[in-house]
Each structure stands twice: as C-alpha cells, then as structure tokens.
C-alpha cells in the first residue's frame, strides 16, 4: 500500500528500503562465498594444478627412464651382436683349424698308404724277379740242354751262365 500511496514515484530510481535489503543480502552472499566457498574452490583448484603438474613431472620422469632403458637395451644389443660376431668368427677359425688338421691327417694317411703300397710293390717285384730268374734259368738250361744235346747239370756253372745272361738283358734294357 505504501507503494500505491506514493503514486508520483520515479520508476528509474529504486526504493531505498529495497536498496538496503539488497545490499545486506549481497554482502551476506559475498561473505559466505569468500569465507566458505572460495577457500574450498582454491583448495580444489590447487589440488587439480598439483595433480596435473605432478602428472606431467611423473610422465617426464617416466619418459626419461624409458629413454635411459632404451639406450641401455640398445647398448646391450650392440654388445650382444659384437659378442655373437666374435663367437661366430672364433667358430669359423676353429672349423678352419679342424679342417686343416683333418686334411693334414688325410694327407699323412694317404702318403703312408702310398708308401706302404710302393714298398709292397717293390717286395712283390723282387719276389717275382727272383722267381722268374729261377724259372727262366731252369727253362734256359733245359732248352740249351736239348739244343746242345747234353745235360747241363752242373749247378754252379748253370747259375753263373743264367745270371750273366739276365744281367746282360737288364743292362741292355736300361740303355
């Protein structure tokens, strides 16, 4: 009613009682916000900032550690590759040494077999020559006896004649 009684009031200017109540309500709202809400918001904001910055620092630390581990693994891999190449080269050298040993043993065995074969051939040749001398001598004496018509029974004479004849053949064959 009070408002209706005052009919000549300017609508642009507020009523002073509303202005006082609004100011008190606003001041009370600002006080509650500053006293209770803002500290909690600041605490939550700071916790969020710390979490983000801490997460970034942890991520950077994890990245640095991962890079360090990667470098260690690469160094170990290079070391393992070098060791594998050395082992491979050692194995090749050992294999070549074994190969050379086997070849040397095979050559020695081959030379031994050839020498034994030559010795056996010389022995057989000597035996055959001796047998042939005896046989040829006997045949020659028998044939000469038939041609001459008398027996050449004298063993010493016969052996001397045969040996001279065969030596003459050998020296003629050697020329």
Curated annotation (Swiss-Prot):
One of its GO terms (cellular component) is proton-transporting ATP synthase complex. SUPFAM superfamilies: F1F0 ATP synthase subunit B, membrane domain. InterPro entries: ATP_synth_B-like_membr_sf, ATP_synth_b/b'su_bac/chlpt, ATP_synth_F0_bsu_bac, ATP_synthase_B_chain. Gene3D superfamilies: F1F0 ATP synthase subunit B, membrane domain. It is a single-pass membrane protein. It comes from the Bacteria. Keywords: ATP synthesis, Cell membrane, CF(0), Hydrogen ion transport, Ion transport, Membrane, Transmembrane, Transmembrane helix, Transport. It holds the Pfam family ATP-synt_B. The chain crosses the membrane at residues 19-39. GO terms for molecular function: proton-transporting ATP synthase activity, rotational mechanism; proton-transporting ATPase activity, rotational mechanism. It is found in: Cell membrane. Belongs to the ATPase B chain family. F(1)F(0) ATP synthase produces ATP from ADP in the presence of a proton or sodium gradient. F-type ATPases consist of two structural domains, F(1) containing the extramembraneous catalytic core and F(0) containing the membrane proton channel, linked together by a central stalk and a peripheral stalk. During catalysis, ATP synthesis in the catalytic domain of F(1) is coupled via a rotary mechanism of the central stalk subunits to proton translocation. NCBIfam families: ATP_synt_b, PRK05759.1-3. PANTHER family: ATP SYNTHASE SUBUNIT B, ATP SYNTHASE SUBUNIT B', CHLOROPLASTIC. F-type ATPases have 2 components, F(1) - the catalytic core - and F(0) - the membrane proton channel. F(1) has five subunits: alpha(3), beta(3), gamma(1), delta(1), epsilon(1). F(0) has three main subunits: a(1), b(2) and c(10-14). The alpha and beta chains form an alternating ring which encloses part of the gamma chain. F(1) is attached to F(0) by a central stalk formed by the gamma and epsilon chains, while a peripheral stalk is formed by the delta and b chains. HAMAP family: ATP_synth_b_bprime. This is ATP synthase subunit b. It comes from Salinispora tropica (strain ATCC BAA-916 / DSM 44818 / JCM 13857 / NBRC 105044 / CNB-440). The lineage of its organism: Bacteria, Bacillati, Actinomycetota, Actinomycetes, Micromonosporales. The gene is atpF.
């Amino acid at each position: 009613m009070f408002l209706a009684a005052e009919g000549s009031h300017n609508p642009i200017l507020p009523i002073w009682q509303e202005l006082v109540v609004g100011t008190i309500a606003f001041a009370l709202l600002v006080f509650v916000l500053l006293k209770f809400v803002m500290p909690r918001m600041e605490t939550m904001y700071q916790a969020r900032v710390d979490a983000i910055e801490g997460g970034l620092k942890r991520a950077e630390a994890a990245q640095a550690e991962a890079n360090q581990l990667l470098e260690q693994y690469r160094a170990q891999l290079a070391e393992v590759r070098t060791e594998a190449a050395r082992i491979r080269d050692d194995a090749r050298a050992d294999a070549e040494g074994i190969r050379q040993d086997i070849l040397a043993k095979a050559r020695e065995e081959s030379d031994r077999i050839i020498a034994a074969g030559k010795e056996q051939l010389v022995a057989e040749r000597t035996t055959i020559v001796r047998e042939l001398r005896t046989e040829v001598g006997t045949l020659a004496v028998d044939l000469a006896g038939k041609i001459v018509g008398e027996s050449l029974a004298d063993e010493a004479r016969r052996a001397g004649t045969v040996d001279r004849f065969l030596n003459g053949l050998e020296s003629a064959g050697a020329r």
